[in-house]
């Protein structure tokens, strides 16, 4: 009951603050060398970064330097975002800051990004800098803070207007059973608090993903569309299609079965056959001969070269990958064809891989293996 009361308290705080109150509440850094405007922009950038919106964060840091070219916090923030020392520019950017003289908050940040263990270093800084939320937030992941769950609960209570990232972390913990029992109700409570506090792209992206975890694909599509609206299709667009396909998984399964039936029907109209083939499909036999890359026209010419008496696909089983971009179908094709004036009983085990798009399904590759009868004609 005590823990649930803490959740309800956080939910109430999120409802009371709202997104418009963030700038007026706690600052990530208590003092910077930047002008007031540049400081505010850096603060928004840190909020974006801690909410996994790195492109938006980088734009904020760059904007702060346009306003104030001497804003050390923005320079440190850009260095902190850079890639690692092996191939990126992080080392050179940090080296360029070696002789800077900033505020205690800025110098502490520089020390953190130079350390070998950021969370532990941040936790240590937080003990000496109680008003600098940045170090308290990063320190939430330190083993010195106890469990990450406890660390983020404590941060959300201490810095409620900056708690978006922590609320997000807590929502995922309950959605995925990370250190706690899976609990959809609690996960959604944290999500709603997160959304009230930070109505931006990542909040909707998280709401979509967690909705999908619990099978609510329609809700996932709706929130992912909001994420695209706020953060652009480049980062968030792919998942809209994925959730839409998951919401229509049964229809896609039937589409694959129907496509298999078309290819197993020697009397299917050519336009129907061509519609389920890719521009080039890889066709393989289990006899270890090289596979053939065929256009739709080449495949149909080969299929039409056989005098089929009958053919059908049986026991079709369809499996999808997690992203719903590929399907694997396995089935047993049976029938008869004429060869040198003789009737041949046809029986093969077929496995095929299909591309799944919002427009439909198309064959990528297929393999035929004789199973209790003759395989494909030698032609």
Model-inferred region functions:
Residues 34-63, 67, 106-121, 131, ...:
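Alpha-helical segment of the N-proximal tetratricopeptide repeat
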Residues 77, 138, 169, 206, ...:
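Canonical tetratricopeptide repeat
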Residues 230, 239-275, 279, 377-379:
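Short, low-complexity N-terminal intrinsically disordered segments enriched in polar/charged residues
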Residues 44, 51, 78, 82-86, ...:
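Glycine-centered coil turns and helix-coil junctions that link the paired helices
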Residues 269-325, 345:
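A solvent-exposed, acidic/Ser-Thr-rich amphipathic alpha-helical stretch
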Residues 347-378:
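Short beta-strand edge/turn micro-motifs at domain boundaries
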Residues 37, 71, 131-135, 162-163, ...:
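Residue-level recognition of tetratricopeptide repeat
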Residues 88-101, 119-128, 147-159, 182-195, ...:
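Alpha-helical repeat scaffolds
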